[in-house]
Amino acid sequence: MTTVLASRAAIHTETVDYKQGDTTLEGFLAYNDSISGKRPGVLVVHQWFGLTDYEKHRAEMLAQLGYVAFCADIYGKDARPKNVQEAGAQSGKYKSDRMLLRARVNAGLDVLQKNELVDTKRIAAIGYCFGGTTVIELARSGADLNGVVSFHGGLDSPTPADGKNIKCKVLALAGADDPFQNPSDLTAFESEMRDSKVDWQIVFYGGAVHAFTQPDPGFANPGAKYNEKADKRSWEAMKQFFAEIFK
């Protein structure tokens, strides 16, 4: 089921209801209606507050670049955290059940892959914070992707043996001063990538903390703050990565 929301300046957007198991999810699709033919698709995964206007705006930015962008909904249509306690409970539910997390994000990927405008041989996934963790799990699930980009996502490695399932290139964009990024997690992540012979990169932005791409991270904490320079640089890094993987 789709509901048309807007079609301004050739950017078409709509909400898309879909399911994973018995759970109804509500995603968001954006593409440039003035472009004909198939084009690369990009899955966008939300931060811990769930699918918000922030991710929808990123999807529209991707559509302006010529991609079909689909924002996945991990939590469910009726699950929209209103505060940090609810956000923590929702994100924690999926971080503690990686198989469920993988099932939810793969359901969103399936919607994107089935879109008639998408070139299924050219698909990537990006995610922010919780979503950054999620796209790494998507890669670990063995999903058929060209690449994933994690923006200030947690880089823990709970199942390092699953690194061997990764078929795509991996780009992690992180704040060098992010207090939520555990150094031991980084070490484990790097070992997993090396041992699994993944084509991977990590870029650190000096002076940037957690949530550096989000003007309003949704909670007051000096360890989570917008950094305009890191935001712009990381977006450009993503664009360069896409130019490489979508050749």
Tell what function each PLM region has.
Residues 166, 172-174:
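Short beta-strand/loop motif that positions the catalytic acidic residue
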Residues 58, 182-193, 201:
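Short alpha-helix in the alpha/beta-hydrolase fold that links the catalytic acid
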Residues 105-166:
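Primarily recognizes the serine-hydrolase "nucleophile elbow" in alpha/beta-hydrolase
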Residues 15-117, 213-225:
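Serine-hydrolase catalytic machinery in alpha/beta-hydrolase-like enzymes
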Residues 67, 74, 153, 205-207:
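Active-site loop/turn elements of alpha/beta-hydrolase fold enzymes
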Residues 6-11:
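Boundary at the C-terminal end of the N-terminal hydrophobic targeting segment
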Residues 194-247:
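C-terminal catalytic histidine-bearing segment of alpha/beta-hydrolase fold enzymes
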Residues 177-181, 210:
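Acidic catalytic loop of the alpha/beta-hydrolase fold
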